[in-house]
UniProtKB/Swiss-Prot annotation:
Residues the entry annotates as binding substrate: R18, H130, T352
Protein name as annotated: Putative 8-amino-7-oxononanoate synthase
Catalytic reaction(s) noted: 6-carboxyhexanoyl-[ACP] + L-alanine + H(+) = (8S)-8-amino-7-oxononanoate + holo-[ACP] + CO2
Protein residues bound to pyridoxal 5'-phosphate: G105, Y106, S178, D204, E205, A206, H207, T235, F236, G237, K238
Enzyme Commission code: 2.3.1.47
GO biological process: biotin biosynthetic process
Listed CDD domains: KBL_like
Family to which the UniProt record says this protein belongs: Belongs to the class-II pyridoxal-phosphate-dependent aminotransferase family. BioF subfamily.
Domain of life according to the entry: Bacteria
Subunit note: Homodimer.
Keyword Mitochondrion: no
Annotated organism of origin: Glaesserella parasuis serovar 5 (strain SH0165) (Haemophilus parasuis)
Function: Catalyzes the decarboxylative condensation of pimeloyl-[acyl-carrier protein] and L-alanine to produce 8-amino-7-oxononanoate (AON), [acyl-carrier protein], and carbon dioxide.
Modified residues annotated as N6-(pyridoxal phosphate)lysine in this record: K238
Length: 380
């Protein structure tokens, strides 16, 4: 038995072996195993991916001006005008000096941190920060500690103990945490940062951009601290129904990354037509207020009912609603039951979440109805 077979067998024995699902999409439904199920596992938070009118309007407006491929890195011949137009729009909306686009949120996080951190840098990351952030931290080679989740007293203790030994310290967090749906207190993080002259703040808004804030600019808008975050990162593959990621930052940081960030320098750029689609939707973000309010209403209903039924505390304040069951097999069996009832939800198991907290992760979208949510609740 080779090491690959052995490892796969071990994963199967502990209920952690994964496989790619064989599914088809029909609007807010998915079809798998001959079952038609309401999709409760999508990150299409505003329901834009299924909005045929938006797609039709975009296709009518785009003409033949945007190629289907960039065929090059942006530093060679892949820097099409739509990239610069979109970065200008991002900077204007966030009222920051500049913005920079990337191929994905993963590319952003594994590229920015290694570019800006070195042996004279200390990184302090939230214990539940996304895997892409942790990978970026490890690739950077910088010293790092992971502070207890959303525990700013622990973070402050680490700053007091270690900050003077380093040229710079970077605090790294998500704004909305992807597995628990809870929120970082960005105001408190900004206040901590301001107590030190060598501290920078890196915030990943992947699950917040588009969904929160009056203009849809994420939790940094909600907490009114956009100007205080040194590296404000977000993605387009969730609420914005597209692909890619962005950073809004000072112009000096943008220029530095163009010269040092390997995933940017050595990757073929996103297709211009893809960037044009993202621009088209991002430009409309302030107009999606009704979608955001509807999504929050649905989320509140489900959070209330999950709290009544779960033995575990529910920390979520967002449209990501975990139903923690504990053991892997419990989560697998409950997911299978709900799928048979017509609700496509998936078990989330270690190492994605801590041991003993296997769960179903309900990811709600604005194209769901209150009736959809009540039907799900009746099966919990």
């Amino acid at each position: 038995m080779n090491k690959f077979t052995q490892h796969l067998q071990q994963l199967a024995e502990i209920g952690q072996k994964r496989q790619l699902p064989d599914i088809e999409h029909q609007g807010k439904f998915v079809i798998a195993r001959d079952l038609t199920m309401l999709n409760l596992s999508s990150n299409d938070y505003l329901g834009l991916a299924n909005d045929a009118q938006q797609v039709e309007r975009f296709l009518q407006s785009i003409g033949k001006n945007q190629p289907l491929t960039s065929s090059s890195s942006r530093l060679l011949t892949g820097n099409f005008p739509i990239y610069q137009d979109f970065e200008t729009l991002l900077a204007q909306r966030f009222q920051r000096e500049s913005a920079l686009l990337f191929n994905s949120g993963y590319h952003a996080n594994i590229g920015i941190l290694p570019a800006v951190a070195d042996k004279q840098t200390l990184i302090l990351a939230d214990k539940l920060a996304h895997a892409s952030l942790i990978d970026g931290i490890r690739l950077s080679g910088a010293d790092f500690f992971r502070y207890k989740h959303n525990d700013y007293l622990h973070l402050e203790q680490l700053l007091q103990t270690h900050s003077e030994r380093y040229q710079q310290v970077i605090i790294v967090t998500e704004s909305v945490f992807s597995m628990d749906g809870d929120i970082a207190d960005l105001q408190q993080l900004v206040a901590l940062k301001k107590r030190y002259t060598n501290v920078l703040l890196y915030v990943d808004e992947a699950h917040a951009i588009g969904v929160y804030g009056q203009q849809g600019l994420g939790m940094a808008e909600v907490f009114d601290c956009i100007q205080e975050i040194d590296f404000l990162v977000g993605t387009f593959g969730k609420a914005l129904a597209s692909m890619g990621a962005y950073l809004v930052c000072d112009s000096e940081i943008r220029e530095y990354l163009i010269n040092t960030m390997r995933p940017l320098i050595f990757s073929t750029a996103l297709p211009p037509i893809n960037v044009a689609w993202t621009y088209f939707l991002f430009e409309q973000l302030p107009q999606f207020t009704e979608k955001r309010h509807h999504l929050e209403k649905l989320s509140q209903i489900l959070r209330t009912e999950v709290t009544k039924r779960s033995e575990f505390p529910l920390l979520s304040e967002t449209c990501i609603v975990p139903y923690i069951l504990g053991e892997n097999q419990q989560a697998v069996e409950k997911a299978d039951y709900l799928q048979k009832q017509g609700y496509y939800c998936l078990p989330i198991r270690p190492p994605t979440v801590p041991k003993g907290t296997a769960r179903l992760r309900f990811s709600l979208t604005a194209d769901l109805t209150e009736q959809d949510i009540m039907g799900l609740i009746s099966c919990l």
